[in-house]
Amino acid sequence: MDLDTITSISTPMGEGAIGIVRLSGPQAVEIADKLYKGKHLLNDVPSHTINYGHIIDPESKEVVEEVMVSVLRAPKTFTREDIIEINCHGGILTINRVLELTMTYGARMAEPGEFTKRAFLNGRIDLSQAEAVMDFIRSKTDRASKVAMNQIEGRLSDLIKKQRQSILEILAQVEVNIDYPEYDDVEDATTEFLLEQSKEIKQEINRLLDTGAQGKIMREGLSTVIVGKPNVGKSSMLNNLIQDNKAIVTEVAGTTRDVLEEYVNVRGVPLRLVDTAGIRETEDIVEKIGVERSRKALSQADLILFVLNNNEALTQEDYTLYEVVKNEDVIVIVNKMDLEQNIDINEVKDMIGDTPLIQTSMLKQEGIDELEIQIRDLFFGGEVQNQDMTYVSNSRHISLLKQARQTIQDAIDAAESGVPMDMVQIDLTRTWEILGEIIGETASDELIDQLFSQFCLGK
């Protein structure tokens, strides 16, 4: 593939120990040699070596930076192109100057995700693996990163390719029977054969979809909203779960005036914890904005932690709030058990019915383990599945698998109703195409461009 040479800073902007300028393309080594002065020309050193030297401004002859330069030659690189990585000191000024020099002498500034896009276009990875690279970068827990790494390694791709190959074998068998019915040595593509094979493919698609809910939680985190009247201990609960003091905790009702969000790993389940402003009528403009954001967070939540105050009797406000959330996945928490009990637990149980109930003291850190176990049990049946299994975690993949399941079902229905084989082929072919979109073999250029535009610069 005839592409130009791209360049970008591939480390986070800001001061640090090192900063890396990455080049990829046919002129990567040549451009670097125009700037680099060391013991040997980079063009003469072996691949996959690191070389000490300096970056020199060819025009002024000024020493710009002391560097270590990695030389990686095609095709055994991430992009399958020549790659140069210039390791600089981590100052913002010098690394930007090195970047500018690479562009002055022939490289083009890379677009977001363009290095990974080239890896895809050059056949190094498929589209699902490319998407997993971004998932890996954005992962908030060990489990999420492991799920992403499994996809980078191609586990999902292998399963998709296997099903596409099975469909091709069915189509080939049907095609031969239609075009060459006189051949005695060709196995008959009977309706029974087609149904058996198609149902096996559908079963495998269903198996992948069965991992979708948990996979999406692994990837995005379980959106968990902490809700309750003002000053029942919601922010203290957030702080105990994340072991941090991000939320403001005071004795004044209404001090959480916005939606605070944090990721935390709870017994293998990644939670995206959201502490909301108390939902109540208020004249305070700032607090009113927080209340509206809280309502929006509630509507998008996977799990709601509904907090009550052990020190106060149930009020109409508690009943009203519970009415808002009762049809969702809810765990009710009676907090502040270290204080005098003024709440009627039996009244609470009458209000919530079979909804799980946990009693806690955030001040004494009591009941937190029980709460964490209840969260795990509610979504993973008491056991978080093996992180080495193949999860489908990407919403795009889940949507396409659902479409593929429908089209393979259409093929099954058509075959069972006696529709001619050449008509059944249409649904089988469409299933093959949809599965191909997951790994990028039948994806449009527009989709590919859109997906890679979401990547960070330098990746």
From Swiss-Prot:
Keywords recorded for this protein, A-Z: Cytoplasm, GTP-binding, Hydrolase, Magnesium, Metal-binding, Nucleotide-binding, Potassium, tRNA processing
InterPro entries according to UniProt: G_TrmE, GTP-bd, GTP-bd_TrmE_N, GTPase_MnmE, MnmE_dom2, MnmE_helical, P-loop_NTPase, Small_GTP-bd
Quick one: which residues bind (6S)-5-formyl-5,6,7,8-tetrahydrofolate? R22, E85, R124, K459
Q: Enzyme group, top EC level?
A: hydrolase
CDD domains, A to Z = trmE, TrmE_N
Q: Name one GO biological process term.
A: tRNA methylation
Note the PROSITE patterns from the entry.
Answer: G_TRME
Annotated positions binding Mg(2+)? S235, T256
Co-factor binding comment: Binds 1 potassium ion per subunit.
Places the protein is found: Cytoplasm
Q: How does it assemble?
A: Homodimer. Heterotetramer of two MnmE and two MnmG subunits.
The name under which this protein is listed is tRNA modification GTPase MnmE
* Protein source organism: Staphylococcus aureus (strain NCTC 8325 / PS 47)
Q: The organism's lineage?
A: Bacteria, Bacillati, Bacillota, Bacilli, Bacillales
| The encoding gene | mnmE
